[in-house]
Amino acid sequence: MMKRILLGLLCASMSLCAVAQNRVTKVLIPGARGLLAAEVQMPENKGTGKCPITILAHGFGGDKNWQLMKLVSDSLQMHGIASIRFDFNGHGESEGDFKDMTVPNEIEDLKRVVRYALQLDGCNGKIGLLGHSQGGVVVSMTEMNDTISAVTLLAPAAVLREDAIRGNTFGVLYNPINPPEYVELPGGRKLGREYILTAFRLPIYETAIRYQGAAFLIHGTGDRVAPYSYSERYKNIWKNSELHLMEEYDHGFSRHIEEIADLASNFLIKHLL
């Protein structure tokens, strides 16, 4: 009997995985610096077939295949919400050179993905945004009109502006007033001069305050990349927001991705359905 139960659970799990895989479409979306590689994950059609869509924005040096974001997409799909995971320019499978990436051109990338989502036949016009680290900053600075119904920021790295002002990014020192053509980061990636110059002057919170819809912030108190005080500042300017401080969790929530994915998904489901 126990073997039959386990076999049944295994088959059910495999069926869910098969449904998820069959409803994922790889697409290319024109971005600020070339084509953006993206994956559109749709739920099973119900009723009119129209559903909300959440767009997920990865962090600095990351990509759309980060396990936490895939977990969020799968959870949303099972609750009738579509998602788009994409690589910013110069990242993952997208076109562009990492050296030419800046926060402003990532904002433009995200705007174009939002426009793409709104044109999809299956979209009902309600959009959710989720961003991690620098992706969280990009989400917070992207123009959000009435179509944006919910925003989730995971460890938003608004510290990037102060890093540029100090001339210290990931421990690499440079002259912030007159930076070189590029600085080489640990791991070999090259951070371009334009990134530094634009980060130096980013009006992060001055822009983010324009959004006053539902927002959810998750930040680890053990984050050594972007201190949680940056999320506290978002909480102060967004009156309709919740802040969850996770005791001793790191910047990537490395040992807790399932928990963070559940928290983020539940918030988006609540506000998009």
Enumerate the language-model features and the residues they cover:
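N-terminal cap/lid segment of alpha/beta-hydrolase-fold proteins
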Residues: Q21-G47
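Hydrolase active-site cap/lid region
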Residues: D146-R193
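Short beta-strand/loop motif that positions the catalytic acidic residue
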Residues: Y211-Q212, L217-H219, D223
